[in-house]
């Protein structure tokens, strides 16, 4: 009998039961195998939830990105259960790469215990099991002789089968469930942790991630290590003595930080004043700056850094070098050297933006949000701000995040050109320099680094994190990045401030509609920094009303019959069976592809679009297509209609093209082809080509935010576009 036998005989749960059973059977005899299998069980469980919920799982999705997604956290609906999920994930990561003996029987027991309540709570939610018994420690084998499992899948082999297993599990669980639960009801964990157990499990894991070795001997002080139960003198009690749960010591045994831990059932804030007293006593005893203060209950950790910021929540602990820098920053002055380089930003509104952010940071705010219309120089403003912050000794290391590699590369080029004295690198570079002062990354790549077995970045690695196009979808999918890194935050968005959603303002600690500063489209047009757009509305009846077979010409009906024959075959009907239906407008170019409509749109573009070079050449154009198949059809029809313009005049640029970055570079060059880019999402945002003068919206746009981003592709100023002196 084992604890995980509660799911042993349930059809479809064989794989997850095996992972769980191995984790339980090897908990005492081989902790490394135990926690690895626990992590695999967790990943299978999470992917099963995604498939049951109908949520898409990205090809490169990591366990961190899946569990940090706001849909999943809302489903789990319990901070306690989420902490247990992340413990199993993290301890499994540690075991996969560490041979330092950190993972022992205590760690594996806690992983198995947490896994039991994670799986049990989710199975209860889907009514796969009726009750969840308390975890029975006595059922866990304490020797190899009592283990019933001898064959252990290798982690890499098991990992490869996880997705396939999750699909099978999702089907089985889905069939056995009466309804889709909105949320999980977390089950109470009977093994309430003592303060010491909290320290050895949650907190020790976080310290280990930050590179700290925890001494085993109470009261022992070792250079560059975390001492436990360190005696302090001068406390306001009868004996004048106290014992700090942890003290993090520098190489010369100067205390850099003190950690006060309370039971997991106690609010972390309960330890704040006690930690402050310990810090004061240590500063007096060692005649040193007051140590950085952490107070935690294992689930939640807060920091008082001594720089002047209010206490704040952090996701772990800082490294020894980060603590040294933090203490050194206490003497820094406000940002007063506001000398802004005209070489980088020479417009008054850009300088105002930089000054607004600096004033905001001087006021002890850690997060700033700028709303700037596309084409007004968001990236340049961020570069100038970095220049100012570095010069004022506020920032040393910077992380720039964007949602596509093309935008990352574009930003990297601009930073390298305008800040030549700072090292830059992209995490997507083959020769990436992890130690570069300014690192560039997509959100997806960074999430992958945070969920690696060996953690690439500590939480204090970056002093400033810049978010390109800060909006709700980014925070919903990749919020774990901004929760993890403990640095100043700068959000950039082209979304009009009244359209920015409340959750984005909440993330930056701001009132609705009140960003740090803004410079919007109408203002930029009035000032002459952007050009107004002229809309030509042209709807096809097919695109707005769909296709009614009874309203077609004989020739059109013949084309539609070919589609109906295909549908009959899929439906298992005989070729001669009668079949007809009305095609909805939403199916056009998603399923039904109409040549006549494509030809009409292309001819309209070539006849009415803005032309350059003395009106002899259609200007740079983006056609926004429904999907890849639609984009290919557009390019093919263009080649048929205008063969004299050559094969490269109109090209598809989307994520199906392996070397899309090269095509974008050619499109951005006024002297090179393509002249027309047919895009599926890739050119909707971020691409900086001032020569673009025509935008064809060949798909419905339901988001105002996305619409304004797309409009911004064609509103930039471009000198001499129509000839010398004609901008």
Where in this protein do the model-derived segments appear?
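Amphipathic alpha-helical interface elements
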Residues: 1-156
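ATP-dependent helicase/translocase motor core
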Residues: 120-397, 406-421, 435-438, 444, ...
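Conserved RecA-like P-loop NTPase helicase motor core
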Residues: 291, 464, 650-727
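Conserved RecA-like ASCE P-loop NTPase motor core of nucleic-acid helicases/translocases
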Residues: 370, 396-404, 619-627
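Conserved helicase motor
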Residues: 405, 426-432, 443-447, 626-628, ...
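Conserved C-terminal RecA-like helicase domain
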Residues: 437, 567-573, 578-679
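SF2 helicase catalytic motif II
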Residues: 455-491
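Interdomain helical connector at the RecA1-RecA2 junction of SF1/SF2 helicase-like NTPases
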Residues: 502-618
């Amino acid at each position: 009998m084992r604890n995980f036998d509660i799911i042993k005989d349930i059809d479809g749960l064989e794989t997850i039961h095996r992972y769980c059973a191995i984790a339980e059977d090897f908990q005492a005899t081989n902790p490394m195998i135990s926690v690895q299998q626990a992590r695999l069980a967790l990943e299978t469980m999470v992917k099963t939830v995604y498939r049951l919920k109908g949520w898409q799982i990205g090809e490169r999705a990591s366990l961190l990105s899946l569990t940090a997604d706001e849909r999943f956290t809302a489903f789990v609906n319990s901070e306690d259960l989420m902490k247990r999920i992340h413990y199993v994930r993290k301890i499994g990561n540690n075991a996969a790469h560490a041979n330092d003996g950190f993972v022992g029987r205590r760690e594996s027991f806690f992983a198995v215990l947490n896994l039991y309540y994670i799986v049990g709570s989710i199975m209860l939610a889907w009514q796969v099991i009726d009750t969840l018994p308390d975890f029975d420690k006595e059922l866990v084998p304490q020797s190899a002789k009592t283990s019933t499992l001898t064959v252990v899948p290798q982690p890499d082999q098991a990992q490869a089968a996880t997705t396939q297993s999750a699909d099978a599990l999702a089907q089985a669980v889905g069939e056995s469930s009466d309804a889709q639960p909105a949320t999980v009801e977390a089950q109470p964990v009977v093994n309430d942790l003592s303060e010491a157990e909290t320290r050895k499990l949650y907190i020790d894991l976080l310290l280990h991630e930050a590179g700290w070795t925890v001494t085993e001997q109470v009261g022992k002080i070792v250079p560059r290590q975390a001492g436990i139960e360190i005696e302090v003198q001068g406390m306001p009690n009868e004996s004048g003595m106290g014992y700090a749960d942890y003290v993090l010591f520098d190489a010369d045994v100067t205390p850099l930080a003190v950690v006060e831990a309370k039971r997991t059932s106690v609010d972390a804030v309960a330890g704040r004043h006690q930690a402050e007293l310990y810090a004061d006593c240590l500063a007096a005893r060692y005649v040193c700056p007051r140590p950085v203060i952490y107070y935690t209950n294992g689930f939640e950790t807060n920091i008082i850094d001594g720089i002047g910021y209010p206490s704040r929540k952090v996701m772990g602990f800082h490294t020894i070098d980060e603590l040294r820098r933090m203490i050194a920053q206490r003497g820094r002055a406000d940002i007063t050297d506001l000398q802004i380089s005209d070489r980088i930003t020479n417009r008054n509104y850009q300088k105002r933006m930089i000054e607004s952010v600096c004033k905001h940071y001087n006021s002890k705010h850690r997060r700033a949000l700028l709303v700037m219309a596309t084409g007004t120089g968001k990236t340049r403003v961020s570069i100038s701000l970095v220049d100012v912050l570095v010069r004022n000794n506020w920032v040393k290391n910077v992380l720039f995040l964007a949602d596509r590699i093309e935008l990352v590369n574009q930003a990297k080029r601009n930073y390298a050109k305008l800040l030549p004295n700072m090292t830059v690198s992209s995490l997507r570079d083959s020769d990436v320099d992890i130690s570069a002062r300014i690192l560039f990354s997509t959100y997806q790549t960074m999430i992958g680094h945070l969920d690696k077995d060996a953690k690439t970045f500590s939480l204090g690695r970056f002093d400033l994190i810049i978010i390109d196009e800060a909006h709700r979808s980014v925070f919903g999918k990749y919020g774990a990045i901004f929760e993890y890194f403990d640095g100043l935050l700068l959000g950039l968005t082209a979304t009009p401030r009244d359209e920015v959603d409340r959750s984005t303002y909440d993330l930056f600690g701001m009132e609705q509609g009140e960003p740090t500063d803004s410079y919007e489209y109408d203002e930029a047009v009035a000032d002459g920094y952007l050009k107004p757009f002229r809309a030509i509305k042209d709807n096809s009846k097919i695109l707005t009303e769909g296709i009614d077979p009874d309203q077609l010409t004989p020739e059109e009906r013949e084309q539609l019959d070919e589609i109906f024959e295909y549908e009959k075959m899929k439906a298992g009907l005989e070729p001669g069976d009668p079949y007809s239906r009305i095609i909805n407008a939403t199916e056009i170019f998603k399923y039904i592809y109409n040549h006549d409509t494509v030809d009409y749109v292309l001819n309209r573009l070539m006849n009415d679009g803005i032309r350059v070079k003395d009106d002899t050449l259609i200007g740079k154009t983006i056609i926004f297509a429904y999907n890849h198949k639609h984009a290919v059809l557009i390019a093919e029809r263009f080649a048929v209609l205008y063969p004299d313009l050559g094969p490269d005049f109109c090209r598809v640029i989307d994520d199906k093209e392996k070397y899309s970055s090269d095509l974008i570079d050619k499109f951005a060059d006024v002297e090179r082809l393509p002249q027309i880019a047919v895009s599926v999402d890739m050119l909707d945002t971020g691409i900086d080509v001032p020569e673009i003068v025509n935008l064809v919206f060949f798909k419905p746009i339901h988001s105002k935010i996305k619409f304004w981003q797309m409009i911004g592709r064609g509103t930039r100023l471009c000198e001499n576009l129509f000839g010398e002196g004609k901008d």
